[in-house]
């Protein structure tokens, strides 16, 4: 009799916990659906009227300079290095989808006036212009040169001697379309992505007709000597031909972080047997 009562009690407990589990599962499902609907609702609540009003070219009222042009769902900057950015407006907030998304509180937006709070907490006042001459400000090309090698094909070759050895060394910087984005703040106090382009550098050394080295270098090839965090931010700017010694032919690879004073210089030595040694 005692065992029968225990078994009945156990069955009741099991049934109770099964009901609790079903209830929790159902509640989670309802909650999940609710969140999904809320997310969809938020997605639909973008202020399309505000987006329509912000279209056009905007001038900084204090400085008289061109701040940006909004066209469609994209903002374009007059600075040739600054990348165009997707934007959205929800309620009184402007969202910019940079590499690191940012948002700005809108104080006032009309057909011809925009006031918002920038990254420093300062109020920025802009006025829309209908002057078509400002369109030319946005019809620019990327600069051909900066403090780093950008968009330039650079070729070098030289003949060097070390003792009785005579070497023919080559170096060629090949531009690529691979972007390295660096976030900065423009004159209006708005975060913008500035785009720089990486390079691939080909080097070769010949002892007569024998190739000691003949290969491409990318910035990732130096990750053993340079921190990975820096590799992600830097450009392989150049590999220069330096000299020939008893050790071999010396090159220097220059890895530079755009818009900063930091760089790594890597010594590359190719010996008479084609062995490569790299040091900082």
Language model regions located:
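C-terminal motif of bacterial Sec signal peptides marking the signal peptidase cleavage site
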Residues: 27-32
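Tryptophan-anchored aromatic micro-motifs
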Residues: 43-66, 140-155, 160
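N-terminal glycine/threonine-rich, aromatic-flanked beta-hairpin/loop signature
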Residues: 60-104, 193-197, 202-209
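Short, exposed beta-strand-loop hairpins at the edges of beta-sheets
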Residues: 115-118, 255-272
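Surface-exposed beta-loop interaction hotspot
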Residues: 122-182
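Surface-exposed loop/turn elements that mediate protein-protein interactions on large endomembrane-trafficking
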Residues: 207-217, 270
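Surface-exposed loop and turn segments in beta-propeller and other repeat-based domains
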Residues: 213-231
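Acidic, glycine-rich flexible loop segments
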Residues: 225-259
